[in-house]
Amino acid sequence: NGERGRAATGLVVAKGSFAAMGGAERDLMRNLPALARRFAVSVATLHPVPELEALCSELGISLISPEKPWEPPTGALSAVLDAGMDSASRAWARCSGLHDAISDSDVVHLVSGDGSLALLEHVPESMAVHLHLLEPHRGLHEDVLHRKVDGSPKRNLGLTSALLSRARRRDIEFIRGLTDRPRSAISGNSSYTAGRIGEVYGIEAGVLMPSVVADEFPVGASSDEPASVGDMSGPYVVSVGRASWVKGTWETISMLAGSGLSLVHVGGGNDGDLARLLDYAESCDVGLWVAPHLSSLEMASLMRGARAVVSMARGEPFGLTPIEAFSVGTPALFVDE
């Protein structure tokens, strides 16, 4: 940071993709200003978004990414062959300036997600690396992502697990291989996640909690905050996260039946799942509005106007959402498994 005449420590902050712009991405972005004051920061990603580009420009931070944003391969065969890891590694290799940024830096702070772990193939063994492992790969180590939005299996779960054995082994090898490096550390985002990391990978992990900037979700609405968001005509609750069985979206609608409360769903989902949810909500006489991508100001307004922020998610720590809800004075009702 230049204090006492010393050169700032070089830090590469990396995440495979920011496309989702969910809690993990928002958490990392809200920490960049503080990191930039302490370190000489470069940001690397295979899929930037306009919000990240604007922030890096404002902070004077170098943003490294491929010319064409990377998308993880889709389809059952890609999952079985673990094609995403190889595809991401090739995309990292195509990032102009990445090699120089790593060579000129002292530390890599890597946040897990699609495409992230493949960066380790381009980081020297001797370099200090901190991995913020937000959760063990749930598609490989659990069956919750292999169920439809209503909980029914997408295909035979035993066969799915067997077909993913190669990808599962490779995931474990990557994580354990990182711990074998002489200058490495792994943190979960909660004590729950740290425990799961121990169960899945057989290693110890620290805890790096998520953070909220008070100005982003203030107790009182700022002049820039919209008075309302969406077209909800009556009382509503908010759920956050991509519509899926693991997020408990289906059960949230069931819970609201007969309550007179509508549901605002933030986080999107695939078209088929959203159509099924809309049909199910109609059958339960529950109003459902699927919100588009929202800014922090819009999220604050939406939460502020809600009766509660709710979640029926399976096997997840509470994360950022309840902290954001509490910050604006709205109750957060989350299932405790």
Residues covered by each model-derived region:
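Membrane-proximal helix-turn-helix segments that form the acceptor-binding/catalytic region
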Residues: 99, 137, 148-186, 193-195
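Short hydrophobic beta-strand element within catalytic cores of glycosyltransferases
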Residues: 331-336
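Acidic anion/phosphate-binding donor-loop and adjacent secondary structure
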Residues: 2, 195, 199-200, 212-234
